[in-house]
């Protein structure tokens, strides 16, 4: 950020190398007085320019230019209207305090407004099972009565095994006419499966 100042437009600018005078004027912030040593200079713009140009930019500080301080810059502008060029303009405020209600004094009041925004978000997840009791019991019964088929063995396809009464379900399907066809089909499927396994 760059700040350019036209010193010729100011009635007078204070510096520590010029004449010192005292004043009781202060600038207040929120009703509090700021006390610093008051400094004045004569309205000789050429002398001030010469002094400022003789210093390197690194050595120039707030004591060399009143405009570097925002509070003092405001004080210069307000006092320049109320005083003439011969009286000088205050660079810094004095150690004395003054009532903020006096007419004719400059006063700056700063108010800080804080905006607080609260954004509260609550996320909830509820899982509800809508399975009816009837469907649940049906599924349990299905799993309960799931038939476990016996392991297929090589000798299970023999004629003796097919005609054996142990394969019948309580005599309901004893030596059924479809039993031989079933075991023949099962033997063929087993051979195909074994051939696929060999090919892999």
Curated annotation (Swiss-Prot):
Plays an essential role in the viral genome replication. Participates, together with NSP2, in the formation of viral factories (viroplasms), which are large inclusions in the host cytoplasm where replication intermediates are assembled and viral RNA replication takes place. Orchestrates the recruitment of viroplasmic proteins such as capsid proteins to these factories. Participates in the selective exclusion of host proteins from stress granules (SG) and P bodies (PB). Also participates in the sequestration of these remodeled organelles in viral factories. The keyword Phosphoprotein applies. Residues 91-100 have a biased composition (Polar residues). O-glycosylated. Hyperphosphorylated on serine residues, when in dimeric form. Phosphorylation by host CK1 is required for the hyperphosphorylation of NSP5 dimer. The modification Phosphoserine is found at residues 67, 156, 158, 166, 168. InterPro entries: Rotavirus_A/C_NSP5 (IPR002512). The lineage of its organism: Viruses, Riboviria, Orthornavirae, Duplornaviricota, Resentoviricetes. One of its GO terms (molecular function) is magnesium ion binding. It comes from Rotavirus A (strain RVA/Human/Australia/RV-5/1981/G2P1B[4]) (RV-A). It comes from the Viruses. One of its GO terms (biological process) is viral genome replication. Pfam families: Rota_NS26. Residues 22-37 have a biased composition (Low complexity). This is Non-structural protein 5. One of its GO terms (cellular component) is host cell cytoplasm.
């Amino acid at each position: 950020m760059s700040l350019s100042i036209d010193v010729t437009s100011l009635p007078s600018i204070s510096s520590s190398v010029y004449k010192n005078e005292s004043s009781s004027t202060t600038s207040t912030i929120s009703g509090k007085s700021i006390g610093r040593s008051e400094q004045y200079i004569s309205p000789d713009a050429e002398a001030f320019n010469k002094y400022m140009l003789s210093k390197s930019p690194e050595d120039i500080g707030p004591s060399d230019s009143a405009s570097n301080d925002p509070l003092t810059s405001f004080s210069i502008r307000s006092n320049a209207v109320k005083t003439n060029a011969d009286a000088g303009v205050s660079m810094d405020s004095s150690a004395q305090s003054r009532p903020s209600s006096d007419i004719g004094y400059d006063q700056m009041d700063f108010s800080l407004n804080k905006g607080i925004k609260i954004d509260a978000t609550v996320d909830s997840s509820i899982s509800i099972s809508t399975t009816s009791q009837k469907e649940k019991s049906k599924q349990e019964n299905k799993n309960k009565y799931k038939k476990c088929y016996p392991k297929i063995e090589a000798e299970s396809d023999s004629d003796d095994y097919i005609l054996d009464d142990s394969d019948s379900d309580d005599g309901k399907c004893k030596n059924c006419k479809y039993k031989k066809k079933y075991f023949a089909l099962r033997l063929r499927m087993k051979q195909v499966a074994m051939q696929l396994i060999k090919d892999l």
